[in-house]
């Protein structure tokens, strides 16, 4: 809108030579009243009255978890143990939960379907984490299991 106001001020001052430039073209809304142009504004900056920064924190935590997984996978290979097994169980479950949550957000429509999909997602994530913890406690663990698969 700043461009519109500046171009309209050029027209009112009879400086038509500015329109001979290829970079400046006449704008169709110049015939509007200046008061109307000034009152209709588009704001591209963020809303300073937002309720929370939950989306920003969620995005940041997703990226932090992805970076942590990049370090956790070599650590699982070099230093297999219970701490790394349970860390992998938590990180992989949370990473999968957030990823499938985005699929639900993008592709599931309708209030009842969204509630059912989110409930199913929470149940799947809880069962996945419980299963991985059970596997870590009662069997060889994630790190040793992957090493055994690689040794085949």
Swiss-Prot record:
Protein residues bound to a ubiquinone: 107
Main location: mitochondrion
Domain of life according to the entry: Eukaryota
Mitochondrial intermembrane side: 79-83, 136-152
GO cellular component: mitochondrial inner membrane; respiratory chain complex II (succinate dehydrogenase)
UniProt keyword terms in alphabetical order: Electron transport, Heme, Iron, Membrane, Metal-binding, Mitochondrion, Mitochondrion inner membrane, Transit peptide, Transmembrane, Transmembrane helix, Transport, Tricarboxylic acid cycle
Protein name: Succinate dehydrogenase [ubiquinone] cytochrome b small subunit A, mitochondrial
């Amino acid at each position: 809108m700043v461009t519109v106001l500046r171009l309209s001020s050029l027209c009112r001052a009879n400086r038509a030579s500015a329109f001979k430039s290829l970079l400046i073209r006449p704008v169709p809304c110049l015939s509007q009243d200046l008061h109307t142009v000034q009152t209709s504004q588009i704001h591209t900056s963020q809303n300073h009255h937002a309720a929370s920064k939950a989306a920003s924190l969620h995005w940041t935590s997703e990226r932090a978890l992805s970076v942590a997984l990049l370090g956790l996978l070599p650590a699982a290979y070099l230093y297999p143990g219970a701490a790394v097994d349970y860390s992998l169980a938590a990180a992989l479950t949370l990473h999968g939960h957030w990823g499938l949550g985005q699929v639900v957000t993008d592709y599931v429509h309708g209030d009842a379907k969204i509630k059912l999909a989110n409930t199913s997602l929470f149940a799947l994530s809880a069962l996945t984490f419980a299963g991985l913890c059970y596997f870590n406690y009662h069997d060889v663990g994630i790190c040793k299991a992957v090493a055994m698969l690689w040794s085949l």
